[in-house]
Amino acid sequence: MARGFQGVMLRGLGARDHQATVVDKEYIAPHFVRVRLVSPTLFDEVIVEPTSWLRFWFPDPDGSDTEFQRAYTITESDPETGRFAVDMVLHEPAGPASTWARTVEPGATIAVMSMGSRGFSVPEDPEDRPVGYLLIGDSASTPAINGIIEVVPHDIPIELYLEQHHDDDVLIPLAEHPRLRVHRVSRDDASSLAAALELRDWSNWYCWAGPEAGALKQVRTRLRDEFGFPKREVYAQAYWTEGRAMGSSRGETSTPAKPAAKTAPAKAAAKPAAASGAGTPEHAAAPAAATTGAPQAAPAPGAAQPRTPVRGRWRAEAGSRLLAPLKKPLIVSGVLQALITLIELAPFVLLVELARLLLGGAEAERLWTLGLTAVSLIGLGAVLAAAMTLWLHRVDARFAHELRGRLLTKLSRLPLGWFTRRGSASTKQLVQDDTLALHYLITHAIPDAVAAVVAPVAVLVYLFVADWRVALVLFIPVLVYLVLMSVMTIQSGSKIAQAPRWAERMGGEAGAFLEGQPVIRIFGGAAASRFRRRLDDYIDFLVSWQRPFVGKKTLMDLVTRPATFLWIILVAGVPLVVTGRMDPVNLLPFLLLGTTFGARLLGIGYGLSGIQTGMLAARRIQTVLDEPELVVRDRTGQAGTDHASGDQARPGTVELDRVSFEYRPGVPVIRDVTLTLRPGTVTALVGPSGSGKSTLAALVARFHDVTQGAIRVDGRDIRTLTADELYRRVGFVLQDAQLVHGSVAENIALAEPDAGLERIRTAARDAQIHDRITRMPDGYDSVLGAGSALSGGERQRVTIARAILADTPVLVLDEATAFADPESEYLVQQAINRLTRDRTVLVIAHRLHTITHADQIVVLDDGRIVEVGTHDELLAAGGRYRGLWDSGRYSSPDAGRPVSADAVEVGR
C-alpha cells in the first residue's frame, strides 16, 4: 500500500505499524460507531492517557493502493489483553474512514501507529490546578472531551460548548461530572461557536478546544482578543475541516497533509448535515443530565449578551506582572550585553587579520596597531561587563528589598489556613529559593541568554563573509542534531509529560520512606518492599524511555564536538584551497571560531533555561501576592454583627450563625451551620473523616474567613477583630505540637512574651511538664526546636502550658492524646483537664471515649449538623452517633492507638 510523503516521514521519525484486528463494533448513535480492536504489540509503546489517540491507515474506497491516515481518540483500553476501542463519526458523503467504519466486519485488520499523541492531565498539586475547565468541541471531539471530564476532580467546574452539526448529536453520551454544564450550539456559520461563549470573567480557567477548523479559528481569536486567554492556557487543535472530505490524505498522487495533522487528530469530515431546528436542543440523553439537571443551552449567536467582555487574569501571566517595573532595565541590559558580546568577539576577528598581515609580510607598526586595538577591545569588554553586572546587582538589590518587604507583609496578612495548606517547605521555597532565582534572572539570566544568541549569530555572519561555502557546511552537524532531537521528542510522546510526575511521586515516596525508617525497620517489611517496587517501576520507566535513544544520544554528542567541526572544516576547506578557489588565510576564522560553533548554538538552550526558571519563580511569588488577605472589617454599619445583651455578651460565648464555607467556589465543605457554645462548656465535634470537623474548628480560630454567615465571639463578629484581639479571646492546641527554635521558657511564653518566669513555671506545673523541664540540662533555658529530644506527649504538654499561660476564654482543642506515648497520655489528659477548666472549649474528637462527658456533642456529616445533644441523649436517640458508638471503630485516620483504661475524658 502507498502512503506517500508523510508515510515516509513518519517512518523516518521512528513510527512503526501495529496490526490491529477488529473484534466488534457498536452503534452509539445512528451516525456514531464504536469499533473495538485488539493488537498484540500496540501497548508495548503506547501509554494511554485522556485524549490519547492513534493514527489509522484506511484503504481507499475506490480500490487504489493508496492508504489514508486519520487519527481517532482511544475510548477504551486494556493493555493486558491488547484490546482497545475508538469512536468514529460517520460522515456523509463518506470518506475513507467513514466508509471503512460502515462496512468493516469482525476479523478485518488495519495498520495503526501511535506517533505524536499528546495526553491530557490535571496538575497533581491543587495549587497549580485551574479554577475551571472550558471545553469546546463537537461530535468528532466528544470522545476526547469525555476522557477529560472523567479525570477532572469533582470540585472543579466544567463549561462544555458543543457545536451541533446533526440532529442525532444529542444522542452521543457524555461522561458524568457533578459540576458539568453543557451548552449546545447550532451551527449557522464558522462564527456560531465562538459567538456563543459566555461573556464572563474566565480568569485562571484552562481551555481545551477541538472543534472544526473554521470554528476553531474564530474561537481562538475570541479567547485571545476578548477574554485575554494566554497562549499556554489554551490547547487548540482542529479535529476536522468542513468541506474537505479527506481532511489530510496520503498516497502517490495526493498532496502532503498539513503539519498539524501530525500532532492532533484530524477526523475525516465531509460537511455533515446541519441541524434543522433553529433553537438549541438540550442534551436530554447525556448521563450528566442526571446529576446536574438539564444542561444549560448556550445562547444563540444573535442573542443579547453583555456588550463588554471581561479580560481575565491568569497565574501564567503573574511573573510578567511582578517584573513589570524591571522591564526597561532588563531591556537595557539585553542591548548592552549584545554590544558587549560583539566587542568581545572583535579581538578574534582582529586576530585573523593579524595572521593575514603576518603571512603577507606587513610592517611591524601595523601589527602593533592591530594588536593593541585587540587588547584594548578585550579590556573595554571586561570593563563594560563589570559595570553592567554592578548596575544590575544594584537594580536587583533595590527590587529584592522592596519585594521581600511586600512578601513578608503579605505573609503576615494571609489566613493561617494558607500556611497549613501549603506547609513549611513550600513557604521556605517561596521566601528563600524563589527570591534567589529572581536574583539570577535579573542579574545574570538575561545577559547570559542574549550572549548565547548573539555570539553564534555574529560568528555565523562573519564566517559567511569569510567563505559562504564552508560556512554552509557547518550546518550539517547542527541539522543532524536537530533531526535527532525531533525524532527523540516525537518518539517519547507522553513519556515527556510523565517524567516530572514520576520524579515528584518518587520524591514523596523517598521522603516518606526515610522519615519512617524506625517503624519500617521493625515492622515495615511490606512498606520497604512497596518502596522498592515503586523504585523498580520508576527505573523500568526510565529504561524503557531512554534505552532506544542510546545510539541517537551518542551520535548527538559526537556531531556537536569541536573535533567534528574541525574535520568538517578541513574536509570542506582543504579541497577548495588545493584547487585555488579559496585563499588559505580564509580558513583561519573557521579554525578559530568555527570549531566552537556547535557548542555556541547549544548554549542558547542553557541560556534560555535560566529565564524560564526565573519566570516560574516570579509567577509563584506574584501568585502569593495576589492571594486574598484577612481584612479587619470596620464595625460601623455591620448590621447584626454585635450583640450587647444576654448570654451573647458574656465572655466566652461563641456563636456560629448560618455559617457556610468553600475552599473552591461552588463546593461547600461547611453548609449552613448554626451553633452556640455557651461560656464554660465543652462542645465536641464528631463525624466521619471528611465531615468538616477540623474545618469548622479552624473557622472559629479564623484560619479562613467564612463564605456566608458569621462567627461571633463575645458578641463581636471575628472579622471585626484584629489578630491580637482575636487570639486574646481564642486559643488553640493542635494535634501536631508546634515548637519554635528557642528556649523552653520562650516556647511557653509565645503568647505572653513579657510573662515572668514564675508564671511560666506555674503554667508548666499545670500542664504536667515542669518536672520534665527541670531534668533537662539547662532547665527552662534549654533550647528546643523542630528536632528536640522531647517525646510526642511532652511536646504536647509544652503547647498546653503555652495555652494555659495565654489564658484565653475560648479554646479550640484538636484531641491532643491521639499521638501521645503510653507513658505520658495520662499526664496529657490531666493537663487538658486543667486547661479546659472554666473555659469555652470546642474539641475535635477523634475517639468517642474521650468526650462522653462533654456538655454538647455535635455530629457532622458532609459539612452539616445532623445531631446535637449529650452523650446519653444521642445514644438514646439511636441516630448517627449511636451507630458510630456501636461500631467501636470511630476514629480519624490519624487517631493513633486505642485509649488507655486510665484516660480522663474531656469535660469530666
UniProtKB/Swiss-Prot annotation:
Part of the ABC transporter complex IrtAB involved in the import of iron-bound mycobactin (Fe-MBT) and carboxymycobactin (Fe-cMBT). Has a preference for Fe-MBT over Fe-cMBT. Mycobactins are then reduced by the siderophore interaction domain to facilitate iron release in the bacterial cell. Transmembrane domains (TMD) form a pore in the membrane and the ATP-binding domain (NBD) is responsible for energy generation. Keywords: ATP-binding, Cell inner membrane, Cell membrane, FAD, Flavoprotein, Membrane, Nucleotide-binding, Translocase, Transmembrane, Transmembrane helix, Transport. This is Mycobactin import ATP-binding/permease protein IrtA. InterPro entries: AAA+_ATPase, ABC1_TM_dom, ABC1_TM_sf, ABC_transporter-like_ATP-bd, ABC_transporter-like_CS, FAD-bd_9_SIP, FAD-bd_FR_type, FNR_nucleotide-bd. Belongs to the ABC transporter superfamily. Siderophore-Fe(3+) uptake transporter (SIUT) (TC 3.A.1.21) family. The import function of IrtAB is contradictory to structural predictions, which suggest that it has an ABC exporter fold. Residues 331-613 form the ABC transmembrane type-1 domain. PROSITE patterns: ABC_TM1F, ABC_TRANSPORTER_1, ABC_TRANSPORTER_2, FAD_FR. It comes from Mycolicibacterium thermoresistibile (strain ATCC 19527 / DSM 44167 / CIP 105390 / JCM 6362 / NCTC 10409 / 316). Forms a heterodimer with IrtB. Its EC number is 7.2.2.-.
